[in-house]
Amino acid sequence: MLILISPAKTLDYQSPLATTRFTQPELLDHAQQLIDVARRLTDEEIANLMSISSKLASLNATRFNDWQPDFTPDNARQAILAFKGDVYTGLQAETFSDADFDFAQQHLRMLSGLYGVLRPLDLMQPYRLEMGTRLATPKGKDLYSFWGETITQKLNEAIAAQGDNVVVNLASDEYFKAVKPAKLNAEIIKPVFLDEKNGKFKVISFYAKKARGLMSRYIIEHRLTKPEQLTAFDSEGYFFDEASSAGNELVFKRHEQ
C-alpha cells in the first residue's frame, strides 16, 4: 500500500529532529532544472506568479539562490519533519518510532512541485513552489508539463518495490493532477472526510487536511497492507460510512465536535 500526501507551505527547520537517519531525493536533477528557471525571476515576478507578498517573494528568491544540491543534515532536513501544515499536524511524524519511519519510508510518498516525489527521510532544502504554479520551463507552460510522466514512473517503482498494487490517494487535487492514473500500476483508493456542521456533513478544508494526516499515521502505526483494513479508521471521532461510499471512494464522517 502506497500513501500519497501533499507537501505544506509552512516549514520547520528549528525543532529537534526525531531521527538522524536520512536519504537523498531521487529527482534532484529535475529539481536543479527548476531552480535554474526560478533563479531568473525577479522578486516581483515571484510575487505575481505565486500570489504572495513582496516580503514572502523576497524570502523565496533567497531560497532559490541559496539552494545547492549537496544536501547534508547541516543544510537540509528530512521532508517528513520539515513540512508543518495541517496534514502534518495529523501525521505527527515527530513522535514516530524507528519502526514507524521504516514503514513510512517504504509506504509513504510526498508529492512536490520542486522535488517531484519525496520519501519521508529524503533531505530537502526549504522552498516554496506549489504544483499548480504556472512556471514556464523548456518543457511547457507549467509544472504539470514539466513533470510529465516522471512522477508516475517514480511511484510505479515504489509500488513494485513494496509488492502490492494499492495507492491510497490522500493528496489534494492540485497535487494528484501531477500523477497519470491510467499509467499507475495500482488500484487507487480515495478516502473522503466529511465533518458535520449544522446537521449536514461536508468537507471542511482544515479538518479534511488534518484527517489525511491522521489516516496516514493510522496506516503507518497499524502497518496496514490491504484496502479493506482502512474502514476501521477511527482516529479523533471519524467513522466509516459504508452507505455513502462507492467503488474506490471511502467516506468517513465525524459528528459535530
Curated annotation (Swiss-Prot):
GO terms for biological process: response to hydroperoxide. GO terms for cellular component: cytosol. This is UPF0246 protein ESA_03332. NCBIfam families: PRK02101.1-1 (NF002541), PRK02101.1-3 (NF002542). Coiled coil: none annotated. Disulfide bonds: none annotated. InterPro entries: YaaA. It holds the Pfam family H2O2_YaaD. Belongs to the UPF0246 family.
